[in-house]
Amino acid sequence: VLVQGPSMRETLQDQDRLIITHINYTPQKGDIVVINSEKLGKTIIKRVIGTGGDKVVVDYNNNTVTVNGKVISNDNIREAMYNTNLFDEKYEVEENVFEYDVPEGKLFVMGDNRNNSTDSRRIVFIDPSDVLGKAVLRLYPFDSFGKVS
């Protein structure tokens, strides 16, 4: 699979080449997955943040994402999140805390590059049947060869 775009930066870079697995695979929180998005008309790569029954809270004021009250930490996320509209322009709103109750049988996904990612904050929940597989190995560039996490 070819990574196209910056939405998973710093974890994955544009033009990285990955191997995915899909045999007997069920998406889990923290996994990096390849998704066939009908809403976007393309394949996207995102991290699973929540699964069915989870409550995901995206708090732009405190720069946090929580799942069931527990803050998700990721060392690859280096910049503060800002809220955007559909045209990727920054804007201010009174309420900068958004709560998502993930329905059973659905996934909530986000790009690691939170400020440049079209993900569940916009396209909402993902059906696990749209997940093509989990990214497990980076093949290229050769100097970044190794396990994807």
Located regions from the model:
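Aromatic-capped interface at the extracytoplasmic side
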Residues: 1-8
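Soluble "head" domains of membrane/secretory-pathway proteins
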Residues: 10-149
